[in-house]
């Protein structure tokens, strides 16, 4: 058995595609709660989106995540699994040797660090597309100190600022440079390094607990439950840094409000209090379960299928 295996990347791609379709509507709600204004709670946000934008509002920006997050998850699962085998090969002389808790922690934290290279631009484009609503644009100007300037006078009507993912990428590159695509990457590192440790480790522990027989693969129901619980744990604990990341990435659609991570934290705390860093935690918990359950199930079943030949 070789250390590097390509099927982990292919299985991650399939798991990622299935999770995007399941999780995107609630991801839109989460982004609006964290980076937008005027929403009282999760239910009010859902109702407001439906009233103003219909069902299509929940699927804004779906095309880009469907194309890109599949690649992102392919990289995450492929890198994590191959890193596990590399660590086992180096420490125990056999890539199939079960990983210790330390091995899992190192592999998952390295995955979180590497994932930002692909994940930051993907997240930024997704969030910019999700945030395209008139109230959000107005809030951007208000917080930038231009509350008295009507949007209409700035040439901004109710239509979308970005025509699609490619137009969004080209606009960001023109206006903000390559660093614009990586705005919020620092906050994403703070989110994903511990976040992936609290993602893969609970999943492994839950799988072992639900299926104590080491000689057999966990049944689909165990994979689904373990993946869902791990996803909820990871996303809830990552909410504070996710709020900062979302605000930094949604920022500068027209004028910049935040100078960096610390400035964003201080400004958010000053204007909205400590509770702002837990905005969207309920949505993260609800969304994290089906999305991650579907992702792990798609990954594991695909991997079993590929390795059955």
From Swiss-Prot:
InterPro entries with a match to the protein in the record: Mit_carrier, Mitochondrial_Carrier, Mitochondrial_sb/sol_carrier, Mt_carrier_dom_sf
Highest taxon above the source species: Eukaryota
GO MF annotations in UniProt: transmembrane transporter activity
Gene3D superfamilies referenced in this protein's UniProt entry, alphabetically: Mitochondrial carrier domain
Keyword DNA repair recorded: no
GO cellular component: mitochondrial inner membrane; mitochondrion
Coiled coil regions, renumbered to chain: none
UniProt repeat feature Solcar, residue ranges: 3-86, 99-209, 218-305
Subcellular localization(s) per the UniProt record: Mitochondrion inner membrane
SUPFAM superfamilies: Mitochondrial carrier
Keywords per UniProt: Membrane, Mitochondrion, Mitochondrion inner membrane, Repeat, Transmembrane, Transmembrane helix, Transport
Main location: mitochondrion
Keyword Transport annotated: yes
Topological relation to the membrane, as annotated: Multi-pass membrane protein
Parts of the chain that traverse the membrane: 9-29, 61-81, 105-125, 186-206, 218-238, 281-299
Assigned protein family: Belongs to the mitochondrial carrier (TC 2.A.29) family.
Protein name per the record: Solute carrier family 25 member 48
């Amino acid at each position: 058995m070789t250390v590097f295996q390509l099927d982990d990347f292919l299985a991650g791609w399939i798991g990622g595609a299935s999770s995007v379709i399941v999780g995107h509507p609630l991801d839109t709600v989460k982004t609006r709660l964290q980076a937008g204004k005027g929403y009282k709670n999760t239910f009010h946000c859902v109702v407001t989106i439906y009233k103003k934008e219909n069902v299509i509002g929940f699927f804004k920006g779906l095309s880009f995540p469907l194309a890109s997050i599949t690649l992102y998850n392919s990289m995450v699962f492929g890198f994590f699994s191959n890193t596990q085998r590399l660590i086992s090969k180096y420490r125990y002389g056999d890539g199939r040797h079960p990983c210790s808790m330390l091995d899992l922690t190192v592999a998952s934290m390295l995955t979180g660090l590497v994932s930002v290279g692909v994940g930051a631009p993907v997240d930024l484009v997704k969030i910019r597309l999700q945030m395209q609503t008139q109230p959000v644009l107005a809030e951007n100007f208000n917080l930038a100190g231009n509350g008295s300037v009507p949007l209409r006078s700035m040439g901004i009507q109710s239509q979308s600022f970005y025509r699609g993912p490619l137009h969004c990428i080209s606009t960001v590159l023109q206006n903000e440079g390559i660093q614009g695509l990586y705005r919020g990457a620092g906050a994403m590192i703070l989110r994903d390094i511990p976040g992936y440790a609290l993602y893969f480790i609970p999943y492994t522990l839950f799988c072992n607990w639900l299926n104590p027989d080491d000689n057999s693969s966990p049944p689909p129901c165990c994979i689904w439950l373990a993946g869902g619980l791990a996803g909820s744990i990871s996303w809830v604990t990552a909410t504070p840094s996710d709020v900062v990341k979302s605000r930094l990435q949604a920022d500068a659609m027209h004028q910049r409000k935040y100078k960096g991570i610390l400035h964003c934290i201080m400004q958010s705390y000053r204007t909205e209090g400590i509770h702002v860093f837990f905005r969207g935690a309920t949505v993260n918990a609800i969304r994290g379960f089906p999305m991650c359950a579907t992702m792990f199930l798609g990954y594991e079943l695909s991997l079993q299928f590929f390795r059955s030949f």
